């Protein structure tokens, strides 16, 4: 099919940052393939692409569909955005839940990138990966999500260097607090998680866990709207010399400075104060014998 617009694939385009990005790019002259998991979830101005990044057959079918559409022009952009968020204490996170978040946030992103790289090479296109400031500054009870984002950031850094010789550029977007529908999902998941804590450990974790989640999600609700990230994605796709990493969102530069410059002990103390966490050693008497 002939189309004079540059083509871009956006994964996780049903809601949040992905949906805002798909709409922003469509309004800026891109032909957007919106990766969604259910029919009817794509923004109206985009081409829907059924794409659950954890299902190899859907990834393969999506690549074939895009290839048939773009032809020799290739793919100008890929936005790796699909992801999920959960909050669990490391001691208590179900291993199946941990595996699933890595399947979506890491393995799925690599699978999509591998699938579309031949088309990106054709167009000397760009890959924009949606990460998180949490890849460098993780929160208590945010271990599973932060670990997946740190893994994704590491892979992105290697990928950027590996494909540069092909004319393909790779950019990592690191947002801080962004208000999306995911906030409600994390809160609901946290309420269910407490019910799953073993009774002998619930007394140790429940108060600090629920307090931290409530405070963190309140900060997310006060954060930037998804369109702020979408505009940075657009810039990363079109800038003559894009940065390797963009920081996005309220207080993100302050957080990056804290992560990069303050001693770990002081960072921990700040987080305890902000999130109302117990002091070191304060729960020793409550540890089951």
List each model region and its residues:
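Substrate-binding pocket helix/loop in short-chain dehydrogenase/reductase
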Residues: 89-90, 97-99, 124
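Active-site helix of classical SDR
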Residues: 113, 148-151
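Residue(s) in the substrate-gating loop at a strand-loop-helix junction
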Residues: 132
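Conserved glycine-rich cofactor-binding loop
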Residues: 14-15
């Amino acid at each position: 099919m002939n189309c004079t617009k540059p083509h871009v694939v956006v994964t996780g385009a049903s809601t949040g940052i992905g949906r805002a990005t798909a709409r922003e790019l469509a309004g800026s002259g891109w032909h957007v393939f919106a990766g969604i998991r259910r029919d009817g979830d794509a923004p109206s101005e985009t081409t829907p692409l059924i794409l659950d990044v954890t299902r190899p057959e859907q990834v393969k079918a999506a690549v074939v569909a895009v290839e048939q559409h773009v032809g020799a022009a290739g793919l100008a952009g890929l936005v790796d955005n699909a992801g999920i968020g959960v909050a669990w204490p490391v001691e208590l996170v179900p291993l199946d839940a941990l595996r699933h978040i890595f399947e979506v946030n890491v393995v799925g992103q690599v699978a999509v990138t591998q699938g579309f790289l031949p088309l990106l090479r054709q167009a000397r296109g760009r890959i924009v990966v949606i990460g998180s400031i949490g890849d460098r500054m993780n929160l208590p009870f945010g271990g599973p999500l932060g670990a997946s984002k740190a893994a994704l950031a590491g892979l992105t850094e290697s990928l950027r260097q590996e494909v540069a010789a092909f004319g393909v550029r790779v950019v990592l977007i690191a947002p801080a607090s962004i208000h999306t529908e995911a906030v409600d999902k994390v809160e609901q998941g946290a309420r269910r998680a407490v019910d799953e804590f073993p009774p002998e450990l619930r007394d140790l974790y429940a108060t600090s866990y629920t307090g931290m989640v409530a405070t963190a999600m309140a900060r997310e609700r006060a954060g930037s709207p998804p369109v702020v990230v979408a505009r940075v994605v657009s810039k990363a796709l079109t800038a003559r010399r894009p940065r390797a990493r963009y920081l996005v969102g309220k207080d993100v530069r302050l957080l990056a400075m804290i992560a990069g410059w303050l001693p770990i002990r002081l960072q921990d103390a700040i987080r305890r104060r902000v999130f109302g966490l117990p002091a070191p050693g304060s729960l020793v008497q409550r540890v089951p014998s």
